[in-house]
């Protein structure tokens, strides 16, 4: 397979990556994390990144999110640099663990990005209620993270990522630490959210069944240095 395979179609792309490489300098020798990545993601796509551990899936997601800087190549997110897209709040990011602030209740955790974006108190309350309802957690506004199960906490993280209405969700193995039953249920909920909101989603996973169930496109990466070795379009009914 050519390493220049890309996620593309005739539609305009919301993420456009060309010949991107990333090398980490260490005290011993350079670590080549990504090599020759070419990828286009269209608006409304649900794209899963899969591949062996250490292949650069999370690193690629972090480059899109402006959390890592590429060594060479180009990347645009909604026609802007990743830095500009981050400042413009073009995406919400969901981490492997919920990353909720334990001293804030659930409602207040969802308010955090809204506070930073200058939303009024009334807007914050209305939006937190709207997105808690969307993820099935109405009535839990005043609870604290420690009072919720792991799956419920991750649903709060998704609500927080959606609260300021970004065009994209970037998700780094958000259900990887959960038991299989909870994970399957949250996958069904995430698929429903995607169908309802039509957000663009880039989703990192180790699970082939999860990728097939959720995605309309699957990007397969090689072992390090990470390259795109295949792009699979899934046409199964959801």
Q: Where are the model-predicted features located?
A:
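Conserved ABC ATPase "signature" region
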Residues: 115, 122-140, 192
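Short coil-to-helix segment of the ABC ATPase nucleotide-binding domain corresponding to the Q-loop/switch region
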Residues: 104-111
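Hydrophobic anchor residue at the start of the ABC signature
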Residues: 158
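The feature captures the beta-strand-to-loop junction immediately N-terminal to the Walker
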Residues: 50-52
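Conserved signature/switch motifs of ABC ATPase nucleotide-binding domains
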Residues: 143-146, 164
């Amino acid at each position: 397979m050519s390493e220049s395979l890309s996620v593309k179609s005739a539609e305009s792309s919301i993420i456009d990556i060309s010949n991107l490489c990333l090398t980490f300098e260490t005290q011993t020798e350079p670590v080549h994390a990504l090599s020759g990545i070419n990828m286009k993601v269209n608006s409304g796509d649900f794209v899963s990144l899969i591949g062996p551990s250490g292949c650069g899936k999370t690193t690629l997601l972090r480059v899109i999110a402006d959390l890592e800087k590429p060594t060479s190549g180009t990347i645009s997110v909604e026609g802007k640099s990743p830095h500009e897209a981050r400042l413009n709040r073009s995406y919400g990011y969901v981490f492997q663990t919920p990353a909720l602030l334990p001293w804030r209740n659930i409602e207040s955790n969802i308010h955090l990005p809204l506070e930073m974006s200058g939303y009024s108190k009334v807007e914050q309350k209305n939006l937190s209620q709207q997105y808690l309802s969307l993820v099935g957690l109405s009535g839990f506004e005043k609870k604290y993270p420690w009072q919720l199960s792991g799956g419920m906490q991750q649903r709060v993280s998704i609500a927080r990522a959606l609260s300021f209405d970004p065009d994209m969700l970037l998700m780094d193995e958000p259900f990887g630490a959960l038991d299989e039953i909870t994970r399957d249920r949250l996958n069904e909920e995430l698929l429903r959210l995607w169908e309802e909101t039509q957000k663009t989603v880039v989703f990192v996973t180790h699970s082939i069944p999860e990728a097939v169930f959720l995605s309309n496109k699957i990007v397969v990466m090689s072992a390090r240095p990470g390259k795109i070795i295949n792009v699979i379009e899934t046409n199964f009914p959801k």
